[in-house]
């Protein structure tokens, strides 16, 4: 190989070799979803702590969940949704593949402190299970009909934001400013 050809090829090979690890480390969809879940976690848990116990029993009208019931529902689904990706919810939750187990979990009597502790544990579980999902598994079917594992994790994230918005409305209806808006 001639010296002039080597001067052209060597830098190209070096650049390609340096770019490969950078491309392999590019954040994937799970990194983006986890970032979003962590942000929602901070806000939902922050609202739960900021709202006095008297506001936890408030509901906007008959048939609507109370504030406490929304926190418990978020907790339950943080355990239930990963089940659709093949995870096993902690045994003490009683949550399995049948959605009726979610209803049973939500009906348990709890104090405010118990709800706060369980809410935080459920987010830790959700994040752990999302983190354990390799990008290659995202295109595979979940246990739920017509839903890929990717769609399941996206649904989990949008579910959190749906209830975050609901909880913001509940807080403001009770003249409580969300902590991040102060």
Please place each PLM-identified region on the residue numbering.
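Short, contiguous alpha-helical
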Residues: 34-38, 42-45, 55-101, 141-182
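Boundary of Sec targeting at the N-terminus
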Residues: 24-27
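Acidic/histidine-rich alpha-helical segments that form the ligand environment
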Residues: 103-140, 151-160
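Bacterial N-terminal signal peptides
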Residues: 9-21
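Membrane-proximal, proline-rich intrinsically disordered regions
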Residues: 51-52
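N-terminal secretory signal peptides that target proteins for export/translocation
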Residues: 1-6
């Amino acid at each position: 190989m001639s010296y002039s050809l080597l001067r052209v090829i060597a830098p190209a090979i070096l650049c390609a070799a340096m770019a490969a690890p950078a491309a392999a480390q590019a954040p994937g969809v799970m990194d983006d979803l986890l970032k979003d879940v962590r942000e929602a976690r901070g806000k939902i848990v922050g609202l739960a702590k900021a709202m006095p116990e008297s506001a936890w029993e408030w509901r906007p009208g008959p048939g609507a969940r109370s504030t406490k019931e929304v926190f418990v529902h978020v907790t339950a689904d943080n355990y239930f949704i990963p089940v659709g990706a093949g995870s096993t919810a902690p045994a003490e939750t009683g949550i399995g593949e049948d959605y009726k187990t979610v209803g049973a979990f939500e009906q348990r009597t709890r104090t405010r402190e118990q709800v706060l502790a369980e809410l935080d544990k459920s987010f830790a579980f959700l994040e752990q299970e999302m983190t354990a999902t390799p990008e290659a598994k995202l295109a595979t079917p979940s246990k739920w009909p017509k839903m890929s594992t990717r769609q399941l994790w996206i649904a989990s994230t949008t579910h959190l934001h749906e209830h975050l918005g609901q909880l913001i409305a509940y807080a403001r209806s009770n003249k409580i400013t969300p902590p991040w808006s102060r």
